Every structure is written in C-alpha cells, then in structure tokens.
A protein has these predicted regions:
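N-terminal pre-catalytic "stem/leader" segment of glycosyltransferase-like enzymes
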Residues: 8-82, 218
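Nucleotide-activated donor-binding/catalytic signature segment of Leloir-type glycosyltransferases, i.e.
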Residues: 227-277, 319
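Conserved donor-binding/catalytic core segment of Leloir-type glycosyltransferases
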Residues: 13, 180-198, 204-207, 219-221
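Nucleotide-sugar donor-binding and catalytic loop/hinge architecture
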Residues: 5-10, 172-187, 212-214
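Extended catalytic core of nucleotide-activated donor transferases of GT-like folds
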Residues: 13-15, 53-139
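Acidic donor-binding loop of glycosyltransferase active sites
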Residues: 268-289, 296-299
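Short hydrophobic beta-strand element within catalytic cores of glycosyltransferases
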Residues: 300-303, 320
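Donor nucleotide-sugar binding/catalytic pocket of nucleotide-sugar-dependent glycosyltransferases
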Residues: 126-175
Length: 321
C-alpha cells in the first residue's frame, strides 16, 4: 500500500492474538511494532483474539501498555469503520472487515494449502506469509473442483491475491543469570509444544536410544501442552515419564523446562555454556522461530532439510538454502 503525503491517517484494524504467548502472538506484535514506526501514516486499532489454549503474556512493560491502549481505543470506536484491516490468523478465519484487507499467516506446514483456505484467502487484497516455503504452499494449492450451481468441473481453483513472504527480524536480548542445575556438561535443547507436529515424543525417544550409555549428555525439553500452569507442568512431566520410564537404566539425562520465560531468559538459554545445540525434528514449520533465534545467537542447529527453516539455514553440503 502506498499512501501519499498530506493525506489523513488511515485507520487500520489489526486483528490477531496480540497478547498471547504463541507464534501468531509474535507475528501480531511484530506487525504492531512495524506499524508503530509509521504512526504518521496509520491510526492503529487492535482486536485482540485468543489463540487455542495458549497463555497470555504477563510482562507489564511499555509495549504492553501501548497495546492495551489500542485495544481500549478500539472498544470505544463507536462507528466501527476502518480503511483497512490486517488479519493475523489461519486463512479460514479471514473476513472482509474493511475496504482493503490483508491476511497475515504462517501458512501450512506441508506442501500445499487446503482447498478450504482458498475462498477466504480470495477475500483478501494481499497475503503475507513468513517464508518462501509458506508461499510455495499457496502456489501449489491448485485444485479441480465442482461448481455447486452447475455441476461442472472447474480447474485451476487457487488463491488469486499476491502472496508475499516477510520473515521475522532479529531481536537479540541481553542475557540474565539462569540456574538450570544441569548435571551434564553436553546438552541438547529442544523448544517445542508437546503435540504431534513438533514430534517431541520421538525426539526424546531417539535421544534416549542414542545416548543411553553416556552419563554426561542431556536433553533439555523447553515444552508445554497448552499453557504455563502447574497442571500443564504436571501433564507435561507425565508425558515425558511415559517415555523415560522405558529407559530406567539410561545414564543420560532428560530435563523438563516449563513455564513462561522472558526474551532475556531465552537468550541465556541459547547461549548457556552447557547447551551445545538446538534439536528440532518437527514434521514442518511455518517459520520455526526457536530455530531462527538459536541461529542468530550462534547455537548450532540440528534439524531436517525441509520446511521453512531452509529459508535461513544453510547446509554446506547442499546447493542453495
């Protein structure tokens, strides 16, 4: 969008999980920071949504106060009219909320989007994704469908608006003292929600199979099921024990790291002298923010040669990225 000088500010509604501790929450806050840098052009409003079972950010800082003020301003916007919307979600939730609508999504973590995403995506004027891999998912999502009115087959059913990849920026933080009480000197780190896509169960299983005889190797699992509560911690611990109980004679260690951590604490985790590599064996990533963060903090990464992380990871034995 190009807005000419001298015009009134454009009222933009940002709809997304801006206050949640989730990947889409990070996307929403990234978008808001970008818009904040152009407050001479945009009059910003926020519709803050939930994101599944994910928890909410608790930091009481200047950025949180600013987002809260935008939410309050939106509630008091009685006419409810906006010049454009930025909708941060999965495409099946996209709606026409303004004359100009932009969808901002991580896309799909596999090779092509669902046909059910096409119609709502075509309500948008433009789509923003997190990676070239995410863009390919839209490019590959071309289907043959049946016209419900005529019964005729229609080929080439696809997303029409342009799809533009925009990755996350580097956000380095100063570390803080972090007492992990590690009993092992060489430790792998995995940062993953305990769910099928992240493949955490197999990550732990394969670690135990490989290092069961090495008493100086550990795996730190920064994980949760859906939040940061005590109940969530107990359930996460139970899931880990379901795997580790099958290796009662293993000499290696599996550590559970649970609960909210600040950007400074995560920086200390990535740079901890006893943390030697990040491991991610997920089935697919819309972007892979922990992989990206580990990379820019200089922590070696072990992951698969497929999905969005190949946008920013380079393997010397392969051509390209």
């Amino acid at each position: 969008l190009e807005l000419k000088g001298g015009m009134m500010k454009k009222k933009i509604l940002v709809s997304g999980p801006a206050l949640t501790r989730s990947g889409y929450g990070e996307m929403a806050r990234f978008a808001l920071r970008a818009l904040r840098s152009r407050e001479d052009t945009f009059d910003i409003y926020v519709n803050s949504t939930a994101w599944g079972q994910c928890g909410w950010i608790h930091e009481n800082d200047e950025e949180r106060a600013w987002i809260d003020s935008l939410i309050a301003k939106t509630v008091n916007n009685n006419d409810g009219a906006y010049d454009l919307s930025l909708q941060i979600s999965i495409p099946n939730e996209f709606k026409q909320l303004a004359p100009i609508n932009i969808g901002y999504t991580a896309g799909i973590e596999t090779n092509k989007i669902s046909p059910h995403w096409i119609q709502p995506s075509n309500l948008m004027n433009k789509l923003i994704v997190l990676s070239e891999f995410g863009k390919k998912g839209f490019d590959n999502g071309v289907y043959e469908v049946v016209d419900q009115k005529t019964g005729n087959k229609v080929s080439g059913y696809k997303v029409i608006p342009p799809v533009v990849p925009v990755g996350f920026p580097v956000r380095k933080s100063d570390g803080v003292e972090l007492d992990l009480q590690l009993q092992t000197d060489f430790n792998f780190l995995t940062v993953a929600q305990a769910g099928p896509r992240k493949n955490l169960g197999n990550t732990i299983l394969w670690f135990l199979e490989e290092f069961k005889n090495d008493a100086n190797v550990g795996l730190i699992c920064k994980t949760h099921l859906g939040g940061a509560s005590q109940i969530d911690r107990e359930n996460a611990e139970a899931q880990l024990k379901n795997i580790t109980n099958n290796f009662k004679d293993a000499k290696c260690k599996v550590y559970l790291l649970h609960g909210d951590m600040s950007e400074s604490e995560m920086a200390s985790l990535y740079t901890h002298p006893k943390v030697k590599a990040l491991v991610s064996l997920s089935h697919g990533e819309g972007f892979g923010l922990p992989i990206f963060e580990a990379t820019y903090y200089g922590l070696p990464v072990i992951t698969i040669d497929w999905s969005s992380q190949v946008d920013f990871l380079y393997c010397e034995n392969k051509d390209g990225k």
